């Protein structure tokens, strides 16, 4: 199964449409996962593209409901879909990891932070596709791609500009977007200085 994973589009669906059309030329996208903010974007994408969009509400979609999280069934196993704000993903991935385990999932898709990440914790895949329209990591916008088989899960985070470049292959290493340069200040200098004793 070929799964396009996006989150935090905040009303701008154009990049998702561009990516979907390019991916579909290679082989059909089976499902788009939208991890919230905005749920209306997910519904509009499904209507416009004619592909199933599995979606959940985000913190900007208002209220609590049965669409705060859901399960996507694949041949490799189930994936939890959630926005991540209720699992406090800003601070740690532990809560989302445990929620995936509690629901017998092999992985979890989430958003909220606007920062892409792809990790595995004890063979549980955790993917945050970041945000295509409002990234907070200096990436210029990111999305995720997951391909599942009966005994396999392959995943990668792509930068939008790299993926849409004429070469068509995108760049970046498996499972992660390039990280911004770390900036430090006075506290960092103090901590580094204290390590010298």
Where in the sequence are the language-model features?
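N-terminal active-site segment of His-dependent metallophosphoesterases
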Residues: 1-48, 62, 67-68, 139-142, ...
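Core dinuclear metal-dependent hydrolase active-site scaffold
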Residues: 3-5, 73-74, 80-81, 145-146
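Active-site neighborhood of phospho(di)ester-bond hydrolases with catalytic His/Asp-centered motifs
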Residues: 5-7, 31-37, 54-59, 80-83, ...
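Short, well-ordered coil/turn elements that cap or connect secondary structure elements
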Residues: 27, 48-50, 74-76, 121, ...
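Conserved beta-sheet core of the metallophosphoesterase superfamily
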Residues: 54, 85, 89-154
């Amino acid at each position: 199964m070929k799964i396009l994973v996006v989150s935090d589009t905040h009303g701008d669906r154009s990049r998702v449409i561009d990516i979907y059309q390019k991916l579909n030329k290679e082989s059909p996208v089976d499902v788009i996962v939208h991890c919230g903010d905005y749920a209306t974007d997910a519904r509009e994408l499904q209507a416009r593209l004619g592909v199933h969009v599995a979606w959940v509400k985000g913190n900007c979609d208002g209220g609590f409901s049965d669409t705060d999280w859901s399960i996507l069934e694949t041949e490799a196993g189930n994936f939890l879909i959630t926005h991540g704000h209720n699992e406090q993903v800003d601070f740690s991935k532990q809560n989302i990891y445990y929620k995936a385990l509690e629901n017998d999932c092999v992985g979890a898709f989430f958003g909220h932070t606007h920062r892409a990440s792809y990790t595995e914790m004890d063979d549980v895949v955790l993917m945050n596709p970041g945000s295509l329209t409002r990234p907070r990591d200096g990436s210029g916008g990111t999305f995720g791609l997951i391909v599942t088989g009966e005994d396999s899960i392959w995943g990668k985070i792509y930068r939008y500009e790299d993926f849409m470049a004429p070469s068509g292959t995108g760049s970046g290493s498996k499972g992660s977007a390039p990280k911004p340069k770390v900036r430090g200040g006075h506290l960092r200098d103090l901590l580094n200085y204290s390590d010298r004793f």
